[in-house]
């Protein structure tokens, strides 16, 4: 049957990736493990180091990237983000399906590795809905909002590239989007349960 493949979730900020991911990890906590990314940005209120992100300095992160310790990394809004090999190995060491939350640049980088994950893109029903969601967060300035929306538009265009994603989920209703996500991962969930992660 083979061991379960990792899962790469991508999609614009505000599309609902984190919410879907939280639901998946809550419902199947012994099957899925989240690969915690590194970032050089400051923590937002309520974020914990080692749980939401590993918050590191630019110097440390650049040194580790140069040493080849990262599967993928990207720069956004002046901050570095990336997935370290150690973070993925830590999840796999617990016999869990590793879930990575990465941007499109990250997806392209992972395509060059031997990770062979399932690629899933989560997108909002429209850019208007996305703008509404981002405004409700109250964490964006007008400038950063415009940047995020421009990036989202570009991502949504690129996601149509043949062969880039195995599945595109349009998150117009959380329940429907979550059902589609679980459906897409049902084979991997079965494999994981068969190898004794129940």
Curated annotation (Swiss-Prot):
<comment type="similarity">
    <text>Belongs to the guanylate kinase family.</text>
</comment>
<feature type="active site">
    <location>
        <position position="44"/>
    </location>
</feature>
<keyword id="KW-0007">Acetylation</keyword>
<protein>
    <recommendedName>
        <fullName>Guanylate kinase</fullName>
        <ecNumber>2.7.4.8</ecNumber>
    </recommendedName>
</protein>
<dbReference type="GO" id="GO:0004385">
    <property type="term" value="F:guanylate kinase activity"/>
</dbReference>
<feature type="binding site">
    <location>
        <begin position="37"/>
        <end position="51"/>
    </location>
    <ligand>
        <name>substrate</name>
    </ligand>
</feature>
<feature type="binding site">
    <location>
        <begin position="14"/>
        <end position="19"/>
    </location>
    <ligand>
        <name>ATP</name>
    </ligand>
</feature>
<feature type="modified residue" description="N-acetylglycine">
    <location>
        <position position="2"/>
    </location>
</feature>
<dbReference type="InterPro" id="IPR027417">
    <property type="entry name" value="P-loop_NTPase"/>
</dbReference>
<dbReference type="GO" id="GO:0005829">
    <property type="term" value="C:cytosol"/>
</dbReference>
<dbReference type="GO" id="GO:0050145">
    <property type="term" value="F:nucleoside monophosphate kinase activity"/>
</dbReference>
<dbReference type="GO" id="GO:0005524">
    <property type="term" value="F:ATP binding"/>
</dbReference>
<keyword id="KW-0547">Nucleotide-binding</keyword>
<keyword id="KW-0067">ATP-binding</keyword>
<feature type="binding site">
    <location>
        <begin position="171"/>
        <end position="172"/>
    </location>
    <ligand>
        <name>ATP</name>
    </ligand>
</feature>
<dbReference type="GO" id="GO:0001917">
    <property type="term" value="C:photoreceptor inner segment"/>
</dbReference>
<keyword id="KW-0963">Cytoplasm</keyword>
<dbReference type="InterPro" id="IPR008144">
    <property type="entry name" value="Guanylate_kin-like_dom"/>
</dbReference>
<dbReference type="Pfam" id="PF00625">
    <property type="entry name" value="Guanylate_kin"/>
</dbReference>
<keyword id="KW-0418">Kinase</keyword>
<keyword id="KW-0808">Transferase</keyword>
<feature type="domain" description="Guanylate kinase-like">
    <location>
        <begin position="4"/>
        <end position="186"/>
    </location>
</feature>
<feature type="active site">
    <location>
        <position position="148"/>
    </location>
</feature>
<feature type="active site">
    <location>
        <position position="137"/>
    </location>
</feature>
<dbReference type="InterPro" id="IPR020590">
    <property type="entry name" value="Guanylate_kinase_CS"/>
</dbReference>
<dbReference type="InterPro" id="IPR008145">
    <property type="entry name" value="GK/Ca_channel_bsu"/>
</dbReference>
<comment type="function">
    <text>Catalyzes the phosphorylation of GMP to GDP. Essential enzyme for recycling GMP and indirectly, cyclic GMP (cGMP). Involved in the cGMP metabolism in photoreceptors.</text>
</comment>
<comment type="subunit">
    <text>Monomer. Interacts with RD3.</text>
</comment>
<dbReference type="InterPro" id="IPR017665">
    <property type="entry name" value="Guanylate_kinase"/>
</dbReference>
<dbReference type="GO" id="GO:0006163">
    <property type="term" value="P:purine nucleotide metabolic process"/>
</dbReference>
